[in-house]
Amino acid sequence: MTTAEFVDYRNLPPGSRLEVDTRNRHYEIECLGGDEIRISGHPEYCPTPVEGELQGSSDRLGIVEPGRIGKGRHLNFVLRDRRPVTTSRVTSIRVC
């Protein structure tokens, strides 16, 4: 397991797993290729793994940096039902 400040998830091979802790939640993400993911960790939106699209991470102004998850930024993803989710700030990122 590798801890990182930033992860460029688009360069990870399909099947790669990320563990992302935010101030409020612990997310487990399986990379399916490109922006496609399977994610769990939110008790309402994704209590069990669901497919979605990872959009990147945003700064405090809401500007999204596509393709990257960054510590101190907010994780942005869209679930298959097209529900957009923005998390609290990322506190740690682990590539498993």
Descriptions of predicted regions:
Residues M1-R17, D21-T22, H26-C96:
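Cysteine-centric segments in proteins
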